[in-house]
């Protein structure tokens, strides 16, 4: 059981070894997912996630090794997972959804009655709030999996730290025209959080969003392209673009894909991650899908992800909800205290209520008017 209070002291870095036994993990294509329905082996759990592949596979293998329950994973984008849950509302095929570029898509799913409540016995002390950070749904229909923050990658060989944009405002300056890359908000929870955070940053007390949309239009003009394959970090590391919008977990996964441990410093010569002041810092989430085919196995999978072993695996790329674990390896001086100090105060309820509207407005008033 974790103590969920955050220490204000700096968290010391250490390497956590995780032993994972061999286990059978089924990574299925969408066609198989849709054709199977509920007539499935009871000794399995169907998991939907956009999580980094390596971490998702490690979690699944460790869970199977501990419980004997097979994990069938559908790896897809947040937007597509949410759309799938809406389509399947009367006949869900998945049991658990975890990670969505933060908890906001889960809040949208709660409003649409797509998720089921679950209070884990070992973690019933998780508070609803920790300072400005929302830690769980008030009705326990989603739970915290990790803490994520949104910043951007840059290439120190191309753009020294002294020259990078130090605030989100600066991304709208004309000097960055053709130098920014991100995923399409139509598919990406990461990019949707960027839009929502920007609108809230500039929104006036009377609700006027015009300044925020002017800012986003300028950022759109500065985009080189949407990332269609891989991560924006690839283009940044190659020197094709100067700024790539990323959660720290996505940046750390990129590092891991490029090197072995003894090459970390060499890889970081070409890529670094920066967290500006007033950045989105939120809980990433895990939830049981309402009326899922394997609810008990789904609850056990959630229990495992919140356990010490599960959190040690997640800690490879993420800040754990267990404050005794160190920052993920590869972030240098960034600690949990850094995240909390630079966190933007977000109205997550407003964001969830306006999630689809913001995406459509981006498409209709920014993309369509400026292409």
Q: Which residues does each PLM region occupy?
A:
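An extracytoplasmic/periplasmic, membrane-proximal ligand-sensing/linker region
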Residues: 320-371
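Early extracytoplasmic/lumenal segment of secretory-pathway proteins
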Residues: 30-107, 371
């Amino acid at each position: 059981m974790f103590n969920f209070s955050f220490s204000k002291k700096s968290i010391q870095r250490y390497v956590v070894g995780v032993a994972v036994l061999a286990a059978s993990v089924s990574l299925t294509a969408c066609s198989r997912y849709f054709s199977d329905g509920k007539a499935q082996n009871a000794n399995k759990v169907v998991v939907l996630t956009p999580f980094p592949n390596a971490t998702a596979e490690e979690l699944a293998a460790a869970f199977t090794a501990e419980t004997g329950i097979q994990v069938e994973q559908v790896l897809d984008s947040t937007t597509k997972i949410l759309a799938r849950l809406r389509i399947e509302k009367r006949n869900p095929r998945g049991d658990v959804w975890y990670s969505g570029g933060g908890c906001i898509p889960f809040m949208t799913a709660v409003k649409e009655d797509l998720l089921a409540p679950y209070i884990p016995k070992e973690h019933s002390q998780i508070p609803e709030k920790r300072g400005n950070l929302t830690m769980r749904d008030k009705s326990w229909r989603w739970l915290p999996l990790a803490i994520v923050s949104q910043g951007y990658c840059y290439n120190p060989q191309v753009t020294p730290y002294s020259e990078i944009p130090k605030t989100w405002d600066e991304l709208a300056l004309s000097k960055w025209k053709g130098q920014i890359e991100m995923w399409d908000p139509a598919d990406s929870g990461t990019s949707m959080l960027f839009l929502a955070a920007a609108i809230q940053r500039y929104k006036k007390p009377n609700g006027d969003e015009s300044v925020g949309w002017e800012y986003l239009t300028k950022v759109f003009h500065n985009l080189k392209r949407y990332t269609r394959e891989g991560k924006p970090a690839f283009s940044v590391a190659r020197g094709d673009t100067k700024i790539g919008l990323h959660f720290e977990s996505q940046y750390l996964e990129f590092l891991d894909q490029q090197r072995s441990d003894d090459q970390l410093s060499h890889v970081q010569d070409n890529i670094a991650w920066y967290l500006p002041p007033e950045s989105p810092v939120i809980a990433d989430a895990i939830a049981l899908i309402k009326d899922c085919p394997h609810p008990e196995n789904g609850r056990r999978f959630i229990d495992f992800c919140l356990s010490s072993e599960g959190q040690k695996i997640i800690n490879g790329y993420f800040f754990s909800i267990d404050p005794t674990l160190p920052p993920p390896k590869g972030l240098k001086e960034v600690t949990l205290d850094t995240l909390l100090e630079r966190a933007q105060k977000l109205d997550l309820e407003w964001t969830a209520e306006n999630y689809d509207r913001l995406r459509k407005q981006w498409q209709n008033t920014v993309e369509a008017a400026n292409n």
